Amino acid sequence: MTDGAASSAPDTSRRALAFVTMVRGDHEMLARWISHHGALAGTREALHIVAHGSDPRISGLAQGCSQIVLPYDPEGRDFEPRRVAMFFGLVAGLLGYYRHVVVLDTDEFLVAAPDCAPARDLAGYLDNADLQGVALSPLGFDLVHRPSVEPGALDWTRPITAQRRHGFMHVAYSKPCIFRRPPRKGGNQHRLRDQPMQIDPNLMLLHLRFADKDHGLRVSRQRSETVARFDAAGGGHRIGTWTDRERHLAQAIADIEASPCPDLRLADRRRFSIRQMELYARHVGRVLCRRGRSAGYRLPDEWVGCL
């Protein structure tokens, strides 16, 4: 068994699962995030919501969760490095009380594949996972709105995968986010310092950034305005994914409309995971996003209701 693999008996003095996210606005997405991950953890007490600035609506939505309110810096000084340092420090502390700490953005949802063992017992599955480093990566799936067959607006109160089924496997969202041990300083949410990439195709990270065209446009414009303010202030925010989002949304929708989108099967997930881990090892820990997106796929019928 490799270093860091699970012992035969989990430490029951610690709870099994905690989930962590950071949020500013986007209340519909947060409500869904809390509902979904609270069910996975078995209690809202295991959800740790970091609000970037005081927001009464977030406080109301997150009742029963652990809440931290951080001061909002309108200049965005060192935004991303400070955010990553906060996450890593919080993970290190929470691992004293939980066996697994999962860090996700508010538009990211951990889902156990319904055709595999973790769907029946996620905590037990993670306890017994043969982990090669400090964190496990679920397989990222970028859920994209396909208006030709999904014409309606997304209803956040209904099952998401009953309304949106199409998208791309993507290495950028195959993030090392399920922590069993504290990460070292110097990495980020997509790559951990001096750590292997270990993608588990039995676990999926469904990314909802582009799951609804209208919602995606609204959030994209808000984020672009925020980055423009940060740039004007010269705060060195180092945010690399918030600009030009409208163009990326339009391109993702065009690409998914042009794809035949066969059903996504376990063999496809395994093949993609192995390929991305090989590329990561070959390129000495670099995440190759330009070579990290699959063709379009459709989530099979058994995924309806998973989120």
Summary of predicted features, one role per range:
Residues 1-35:
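N-proximal low-complexity "stem/linker" segments adjacent to membrane-targeting elements
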Residues 15, 105, 199-201:
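Residues that flank catalytic or metal-binding motifs in active/ligand-binding sites
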Residues 26-27, 108-111:
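Short acidic, S/G/P-rich loop/turn micro-motifs used as interaction or catalytic elements
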Residues 35-45:
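Short, acidic, metal-binding catalytic loop of nucleotide-sugar glycosyltransferases
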Residues 45, 99, 107, 134, ...:
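Conserved acidic residues
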Residues 48-51:
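Short internal beta-strands
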Residues 55-104, 112:
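Active-site-proximal specificity loops/subdomain of glycosyltransferases
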Residues 81-85, 112-307:
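Catalytic-site signature of metal-activated, phosphate-bearing donor transferases
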